[in-house]
Amino acid sequence: MEQVDSSTELHLNRKDLAALAEDVVKEEVILESSSHHHHHHHHQLDTKVRMVTSSSNDNSGSGGASGGTSGAGGGNGGGGVVSVPVSLPIGSMITGTTFNVITPDQLPPHFKPMLCVDNNGYLSGSTVSMGNDLKTIVIQQQQTQPGGGGGGANNAGTNTTATNTIGLNHDGSGSNNSHDSLATLEHAAGGASGVGGGGGGTGGGSSGWSENPSTQHNEVFQIRCKTTCAELYRSKLGSGGRGRCVKYKDKWHTPSEFEHVCGRGSSKDWKRSIKYGGKSLQSLIDEGTLTPHATNCSCTVCCDDEAGESASGPVRLFTPYKRRKRNQTDLDMESGPKRKRNTHHSNNNNSNTNNNNTSGSGANNCVDVTAAVAAATASVVDENNMFLSEENITSKDEPWAALNDSLDTSTELVDQSQMGNTYERETFVVNINDGSSIAVLDTSQSMKNIEHVYCTMVKATNDFKRMLNDMKQSFERRIEVLQKERDAAVSAMRVQVHADIDDPNISGSLHGNEIISAKKCANCNREALAECSLCRKTPYCSEFCQRKDWNAHQVECTRNPQTTTQQVMLLIDDQS
C-alpha cells in the first residue's frame, strides 16, 4: 500500500490508449478514481486531469509546467505525462463546459480508466489505431488577473482554482466553440508556458476588443470561416471584393474569395461570417479596430488585383448609411409648399400687425376682408352699362396676355408695367368667434381699403373696354380684307367664264355632250367618255384606247395636215 499526496494515479501506456480510442479523437479526459485500485487506502479523492503530449510532434510544445500541490516544475521537452491538480470535483468541472462530454452520473458503476468522446458525442469501444500522435487537453480558465510568463509554483497555486471548462487544441484550428485554442492554452492552469515564451492577455471572453491594447495595434489577425483558419492583414484590408488581405495556404484572397474557399460563397455579409476570437469581424469594425474601405475606393490596396503598384487614388472609407422610407420622402415633399405658403401669409400679416394680434385660440376661423368686400361689390356698373365680375380680374403682370396674341401688331397696346401695383390686395385676418376683434378695425382704414378695391375694379373695367374696342377694330379690318379678296376672285371667275363661252370649240362641245355620251369608243366599242382634242370627232373611253388607235386615227384627223404628227393629243372629258 503506497499513498502519494493523498491521491492515487493510474498510468496508461500507449497500447491501452489505442485499444479504447477512436480514429477521430477530439478530446481525452483521464478520470482517476480510488474505487478499483490495489493502492486505495487514502481518505480523500483528488481528481487530476492529465495533459498528454506526443513525443514526435510536440518537442517544442510544453517546455515546463508547474504543479500547485507538489510545487515541482518539469522541463521535459519530449513526450511525457504532466499532472495538473484541480481543486474542483470532476462532476462540476464537466457539467460547466459547453463541450460534448459524459458526466460521471452516466458512467457504469465499475471503473472506467478512459473515456473517448468526439465532437458529435459518439462513444466507441472498438480497437482503432492511433499511430504515434496523441491529442492535447486544454484547460480553459476564467482568470481574475492576466496570466504572466513562464511557470512557477506560486503562480500555479493561484490560478488553478477557477477551472471550469475543458477544451481541445486538435490541429491548431480550434475547438467547438472557440477557434483560438492557442490563446486559451496560454491562460491554462498553473500559468504553464513553453520554453521560449509566456502566456499573456485577458482570460475572459466577454471583454471587448477595445479594452485590449494589443488587439488595437495588431497587424495580423487569426481569422476563421467555418473550420478554415487563415491570417488577415490589417494594412491590406480593402472591402469585401477588393483588397487581398487574407493569406491562406501561401495564397492571398479577398474576404469574399476566402468565404468561397471555405464553402460560404452564398454568404451575404463577409463581416459576420468571418470570425476572430469567437466574434465576427463586424464587432472589430464597430470598435474601430478594423476600418474597411468603400466599394468604389481607388487606392493602391483596393486596386492590387493585377497592377496594384501603379494604381493610385484617394482612400475612401466606408460610411454606413440608413435609407429613408418612401413615406417620409413623400411627406417632406408635400410639406414644402405648405411651409412656403405659410411664409407668404406671414409676410402679409406683418404689414398689419395691429389687426392680427388680437387672439390666438381661434386662428383657424378667419375671414378675408377683401373677399367680403368683393362679395358686396360683386358687380360694378360703369358709365357704359358694362357689367364686370370678379373673374375678369387676373394677375397684375399680364392680365390680358391671351388677348394680346390675337390682336394685330399695328394695334396700339397699353403698357401694363406702367400701371403699378394696382391689382395688389391687402389681406386682413379677423377672428369670427371674437366680436371685439372685428371692432378693432378702424373705419377709415376700412373705407380706404374699399376705395382701393373700387379703383382697382374700375381700372380693370377701363382696360377691358379698351381691349375690346381694339379687338373690334382689328376684326373689322380683317373682314374688309377678306371681302376685297372675295370680290376679286368673283370678278376673275366671271371673266374666265365669258372667255370660255366665246370659244367655238368649247361651245360646240357643250352643245354636243348628249351626242358624245351616246357614242361608243372607237377602239374597244365601250361607252365613250372623251373625244380627240384635235378633231373633236372620234370618241374614246380612255387614254389607252386613244394611244392604241392613234396610228389609224392620225390619217383621219386632218384639222391641220402639216402639223398632224406634231400635235399633242388631249382627252376632254364630257363631264367637265
From Swiss-Prot:
Broad class of where this protein is predominantly found: nucleus
Pfam families to which the protein is assigned, alphabetical: SAND, zf-MYND
Keyword Cell membrane: no
Source species, domain of life: Eukaryota
Gene Ontology cellular-component terms listed: nucleus; polytene chromosome
Residue ranges, compositional bias (Gly residues): 61-76, 191-207
Zinc finger intervals, MYND-type: 521-557
Descriptive protein name: Deformed epidermal autoregulatory factor 1
Species the sequence originates in: Drosophila melanogaster (Fruit fly)
